[in-house]
Amino acid sequence: MRKTSTYGLCLALASLAAPASAQTNVPGDPYVNDPVGIVADPCPPGRTIDNSGGWQMWNLHLLTRDFGQLCRYRADNARLAASGAAVRVVFIGDSITDSWIGADPAFFTGGLVDRGISGQTTPQMLVRFRQDVLALRPAAVHIMAGTNDIGGSTGAATIETVEGNIATMAELAKAHGIKVIIASIPPAAAFRWSPQTRPVPQIAALNRRLADYARRNGFTYVDYHPVLATPAGAMKPGLASDGVHPTPAGYAAMRPVALAAIAKTLGGR
């Protein structure tokens, strides 16, 4: 028994050690020369990180070099801080937030700042919350997250974990004097990238929990479903390009709802 246990322990240790080497040295990895470990500047100069090397290599890059994608907005944050411009609301989220500024650039004026990153889950947003939200010292933060957690983009998670990640972001904001707006997870009947997932009941369950959490903690809850969703929980026809990501018409429907939530949260600020 002891011999077997020792062998098993060695095997386990080997399996833990091996990926650390394998994940940073893979043939064909376009990011092989990117910095790793504790360095003065983790963001490679002179190029933009993207998924041109293929989805598998992009996932490898995220897992081993920039899980929270801190490099994405690092330069933008520095420019914003140097400008001295007041930040009213930071919008943090996934591709639905990331694409919002492209569909409605006029919305992100007057101190509204987009910090969405396509594909992100709540643990990834937590990693960058200090840099992309707290450090900008906004009056409020709009948190819209959970779609990719339900789709399994970074593995499995319980509904409690996803709610907890959003709650942690909200409570960090509150501790720094930042007002909190928690958004509903937008409607979706299916995910193209995760065809086995049936998201409607999970979205509904998480939104109930988020609405209750916001109410109990005095945060604003903004629900986009009345303007986006069908009675069955899908996106209304014409409001999403793929049943998930809003079209310009979808964002136009969201705009007054978001502005009302900001007015409720900040008043005249």
Set out the residue ranges of the language-model regions.
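Short linear Ser/Thr-Pro motifs
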Residues: 15-18, 95, 184
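A short beta-strand-loop structural module common to alpha/beta enzyme folds
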Residues: 111-124
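N-terminal secretory targeting modules
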Residues: 1-90, 102, 107, 136, ...
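Alpha-helical cap/lid subdomain in secreted, periplasmic
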Residues: 105-111, 126-269
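Hydrophobic residues at beta-strand termini and immediately following loops
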Residues: 92, 115, 222-224
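Catalytic nucleophile-elbow at a beta strand-turn-alpha helix junction centered on a G-D-S/GDSL motif
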Residues: 86-102, 118-121
